[in-house]
């Protein structure tokens, strides 16, 4: 068996399949691109959906990758088991309609057992197969030579997630020996594929050969695929003879760095401490990679997952005696471990550390608030009949303040109290259900479109061309290939086209199609990419079109010009944001429409008005500098050396286009652009807002739309000038300031009048003193506007000491307010204003509360206000 470090093992896997004709694909971002069904990329195959469902045909149908992935469905098990992790790497080889079982199985065996590769002991390898998959069984036994005693048939070996591609699979297990088991040798689960620690699953090969239809039936797919997944960390634990994944070179440096910050704690000395070390090591890996790919802590979605991981790790740091923020110090350690294959963490270590430190500091304040709440919950439980902290309260401690359930239980037991575990579990399950619904179907896979996949005809988009003659090579009507289109709708493919197909945020060109006589035959309303990268023209048919004939394609020139303006302006905006806010700012999405753009980007903090103006100024300065826009076609590596900015979720083919505007902006981009920045004319930001945790959005207009926007604002300014009667535009501000001062003076005078009126009304109210028991009481509905007036009367009542109790109401058409104020005599009798008002507020459709000496409530049923006052008075005796 080879002794390899993590970098050597990862590279060996990729090299093996590269030698077998596979294209090595770089790991995709953890943040899914164009896939709303996924919260995170959670497997290697998650990045292959577009190939397996046929929406895109890869340049090479053989692909291999090492894909970083995140799964958080079993977060509570991380640290407690040998294998659970949130971040992991999935090694995989994939065939998109190329090879199948006859190649996939022997290759897996060769990589695992050949002396040239991993050289694992063949006697320690077992496989499981689906009972009906006799072909896989035969290959394992007859071709590979695996004895029958090492082949286990399991009904579970069928990969099926509902509608879409599915098929049998074969799992490979490594026997770690009974000495590493967690069940007795005679346990019924002690077999490959059972619940035990002896047989470690290291590789799964899925033979995707069927399509699961909506009616529950299965049909063979037109193209059979191979999808495999090997857990890098699991196999590494074998190669490094590590008891668990956490003793490999991927985790130990993080654990050792944590030891140095702890209060003398050592990994391996104490089981409880070991759990904390493992949780910290695992979580900081996931946190670092996720932030590096553009995610930021927040209250929803990915942001919530990050926040939860960070808090769990921080709490475990406290268990190890680490005070204050410390996780941010581990980010460079993670970067050093992974930089050979994933340089993004090391390259962004400063920014990632800053984000983590900020979040740790925030949690420090939250933690203290949580401890205060825990004390309140204990007091509440001590005064309850069942001496129990409710499950809902315990879950709030967990969910809002990051307190593990066990910590709440421990604190309760110290006081002789219990915690409602059933209630807690119910709240937890409800949250998981909400999360499941939010995630959607994490493994959803579309069905293959056989019609589009069969089309092999070339279809070339030609940059810089506005009209040209082209041959119609394919016609699709109602998902079928036909020779003639004479209905209302059709999809057309031409051998070459001036129409840009929607991609990279830029919407498609529109335009017209003419026959050789100059007759309009179709209007192009959309253009999209087919699986084999042809351009699909979606058209409204005007006159019949015939396959094989030549037509003139003519795009809407004005629309294209507007798109060029917006797309080039988007690049300038991206560069300006990075210049003003910092190079950690990443694009998080964009929409490019004619003379309008929407740009989403990552930012920890809100943008100040000054920063936003600076960004806008920089973009316009670059427009006025009349910079030549240079486009170069090259390979990705050369493009990167040129300084081209690669999007964190970008996947690039062998040939890429680099769009350059001097040294200010250099990006990979396949869109259409101006020849010179001066063609943009003018750039105007019309809105900026937060759209999610750490993600903000700018909307802007260019050229004609920018002029129209500014002209509209100028018209509004002229109207305001007329309304405030300013002699010129420059005088509007001073005129408004003068009007505001007049308004403040009038409001002040009005308030004085109202105070006099209320004082007069208060005098009449104070004359209505009556006795209830041994208390003097004023209880009435006052003829005032609302709560502010009631509070003024209460202040006057308090200063004059008119009675022991004041109960006032005020009502309007659809609202009611109530105020109760108690003097010292009433308080000495044990009365509490807050309790009184809570007991009667529902009578007038409201709710409220307050202090023992004063409370207030609001409601929506004014008709019930007098009854509520009477009910409050009745409780005084």
From Swiss-Prot:
Binding residue positions for Zn(2+): 567, 571, 669, 673
Enzyme Commission number: 6.1.1.7
GO biological process, one term: alanyl-tRNA aminoacylation
Subcellular location: Cytoplasm
Coiled-coil region: none
Gene3D superfamilies, sorted: 2.40.30.130, 3.10.310.40, 3.30.54.20, Bira Bifunctional Protein, Domain 2 (3.30.930.10), Threonyl-trna Synthetase, Chain A, domain 2 (3.30.980.10)
Keywords associated with the record: Aminoacyl-tRNA synthetase, ATP-binding, Cytoplasm, Ligase, Metal-binding, Nucleotide-binding, Protein biosynthesis, RNA-binding, tRNA-binding, Zinc
GO cellular component: a single term: cytosol
Keyword Cell wall biogenesis/degradation included in the entry's annotation: no
Domain of life: Bacteria
Xref: SMART domains: tRNA_SAD (SM00863)
Keyword Metal-binding listed: yes
Main location: cytoplasm
SUPFAM superfamilies membership: Class II aaRS and biotin synthetases, Putative anticodon-binding domain of alanyl-tRNA synthetase (AlaRS), ThrRS/AlaRS common domain, Translation proteins
Annotated PROSITE patterns: AA_TRNA_LIGASE_II_ALA
Required co-factors: Zn(2+)
Residues passing through the membrane, by range: none
Pfam family, any one: tRNA-synt_2c
Catalytic activity: tRNA(Ala) + L-alanine + ATP = L-alanyl-tRNA(Ala) + AMP + diphosphate
InterPro entries: aa-tRNA-synth_II/BPL/LPL, Ala-tRNA-lgiase_IIc, Ala-tRNA-ligase_IIc_anticod-bd, Ala-tRNA-synth_IIc_core, Ala-tRNA-synth_IIc_N, Ala-tRNA_ligase, Ala_tRNA_ligase_euk/bac, DHHA1_dom
Any one GO molecular function term: catalytic activity, acting on a protein
Cofactor info, note text: Binds 1 zinc ion per subunit.
Family: Belongs to the class-II aminoacyl-tRNA synthetase family.
NCBIfam families to which the protein is assigned, alphabetical: alaS
Domain description: Consists of three domains; the N-terminal catalytic domain, the editing domain and the C-terminal C-Ala domain. The editing domain removes incorrectly charged amino acids, while the C-Ala domain, along with tRNA(Ala), serves as a bridge to cooperatively bring together the editing and aminoacylation centers thus stimulating deacylation of misacylated tRNAs.
Protein name in UniProt: Alanine--tRNA ligase
């Amino acid at each position: 068996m080879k002794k390899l470090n993590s970098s050597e093992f990862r590279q060996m896997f990729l090299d093996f399949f590269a030698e077998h004709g596979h294209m090595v694909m770089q790991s995709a971002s953890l943040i899914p691109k164009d896939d709303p069904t996924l919260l995170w990329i959670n497997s290697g195959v998650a990045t292959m959906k577009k190939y397996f469902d046929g929406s895109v045909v890869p340049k090479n149908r053989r692909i291999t990758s090492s894909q970083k992935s995140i799964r958080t469905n079993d977060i509570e098990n991380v640290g407690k088991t040998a294998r659970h992790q949130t971040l992991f790497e999935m090694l995989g080889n994939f065939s998109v309609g190329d090879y199948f079982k006859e190649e996939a199985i022997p290759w897996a065996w060769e990589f695992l057992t050949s002396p040239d590769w991993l050289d694992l002991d063949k006697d320690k390898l077992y496989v499981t197969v689906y009972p009906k998959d006799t072909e896989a069984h035969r290959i394992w036994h007859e071709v590979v030579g695996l004895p029958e005693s090492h082949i286990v048939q399991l009904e579970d070996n069928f990969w099926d997630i509902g509608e879409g591609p599915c098929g049998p699979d074969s799992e490979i297990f490594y026997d770690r020996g009974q000495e590493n088991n967690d069940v007795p040798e005679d346990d019924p689960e002690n077999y490959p594929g059972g619940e035990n620690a002896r047989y470690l699953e290291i590789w799964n090969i899925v033979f995707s050969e069927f399509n699961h239809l909506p009616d529950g039936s299965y049909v063979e797919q037109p193209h059979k695929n191979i999808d495999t997944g090997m857990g890098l960390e699991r196999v590494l634990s074998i190669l490094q003879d590590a008891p668990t994944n956490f003793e490999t070179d991927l985790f130990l440096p993080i654990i050792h760095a944590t030891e140095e910050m702890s209060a003398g704690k050592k990994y391996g000395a104490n089981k409880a401490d070991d759990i904390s070390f493992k949780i910290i090591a695992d979580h900081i890996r996931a946190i670092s990679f996720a932030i590096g790919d553009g995610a930021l802590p927040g209250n929803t979605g990915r942001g919530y997952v990050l926040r939860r991981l960070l808090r769990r790790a921080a709490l475990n740091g406290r268990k190890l005696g680490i005070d204050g923020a410390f996780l941010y110090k581990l980010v460079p350690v993670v970067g050093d471990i992974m930089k050979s294959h994933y340089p993004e963490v090391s390259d962004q270590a400063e920014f990632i550390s800053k984000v983590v430190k900020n979040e740790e500091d925030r949690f420090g304040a939250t933690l203290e608030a949580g401890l205060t709440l825990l004390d309140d919950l204990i007091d509440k439980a001590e005064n309850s009949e069942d001496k129990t902290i409710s499950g809902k309260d315990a879950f709030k401690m967990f969910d809002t303040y990051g307190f593990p359930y066990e910590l709440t239980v421990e604190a309760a037991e110290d006081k002789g109290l219990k915690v409602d575990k059933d209630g807690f579990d119910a709240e937890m399950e409800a949250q998981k259900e909400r999360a499941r619904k939010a995630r959607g179907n994490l493994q959803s896979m579309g069905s293959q479109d056989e019609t589009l996949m069969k089309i092999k005809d070339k279809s070339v988009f030609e940059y810089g061309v506005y009209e040209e003659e082209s041959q119609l090579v394919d016609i699709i009507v109602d998902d079928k290939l036909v020779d003639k289109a004479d209905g209302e709708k059709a999809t057309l493919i031409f051998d070459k086209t001036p129409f840009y197909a929607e991609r990279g945020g830029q919407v498609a060109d529109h335009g017209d199609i003419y026959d050789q006589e100059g007759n309009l035959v179709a209007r192009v309303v959309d253009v999209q990419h087919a699986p084999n990268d042809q351009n699909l023209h979606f058209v409204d048919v005007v006159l019949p079109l015939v396959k094989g004939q030549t037509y003139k394609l003519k795009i809407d020139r004005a629309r294209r010009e507007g798109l060029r303006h917006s797309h080039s302006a988007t690049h300038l905006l991206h560069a300006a944001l990075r210049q003003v806010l910092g190079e950690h700012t990443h694009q998080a999405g964009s929409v490019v429409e004619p003379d309008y753009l929407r740009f989403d980007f990552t930012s920890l903090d809100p943008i100040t008005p000054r920063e936003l103006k600076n960004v806008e100024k920089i973009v316009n300065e670059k427009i006025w500098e009349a910079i030549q826009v240079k486009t170069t076609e090259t390979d990705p590596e050369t493009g990167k050396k040129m300084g081209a900015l690669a999007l964190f979720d970008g996947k690039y083919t062998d040939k890429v286009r680099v769009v350059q505007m001097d040294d200010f902006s250099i990006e990979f981009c396949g869109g259409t652009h101006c020849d010179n920045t001066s063609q943009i004319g003018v750039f105007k930001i019309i809105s900026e807002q937060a759209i999610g945790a750490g993600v903000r959005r700018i909307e802007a207009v260019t050229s004609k739309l920018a002029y129209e926007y500014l002209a509209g604002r100028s018209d509004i300014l002229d109207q305001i000038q007329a309304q405030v009667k300013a002699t010129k535009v420059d005088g509007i501000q001073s005129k408004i300031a003068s009007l505001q001062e007049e308004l403040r003076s009038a409001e002040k005078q009005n308030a004085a009048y109202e105070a006099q009126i209320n004082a007069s009304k208060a005098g009449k109210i104070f004359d209505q003193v009556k006795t209830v028991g041994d208390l003097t009481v004023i209880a009435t509905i006052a003829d005032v506007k609302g709560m502010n007036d009631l509070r003024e009367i209460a202040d006057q009542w308090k200063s004059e000491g008119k009675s022991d109790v004041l109960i006032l109401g005020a009502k309007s058409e659809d609202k009611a307010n109530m105020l109760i104020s108690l003097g010292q005599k009433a308080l000495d009798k044990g009365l509490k204003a807050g309790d009184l008002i809570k007991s009667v507020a529902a009578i007038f459709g409201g709710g409220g509360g307050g202090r023992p000496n004063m409370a207030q409530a609001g409601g929506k049923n004014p008709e019930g206000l007098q009854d509520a006052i009477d009910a409050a008075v009745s409780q005084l005796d």
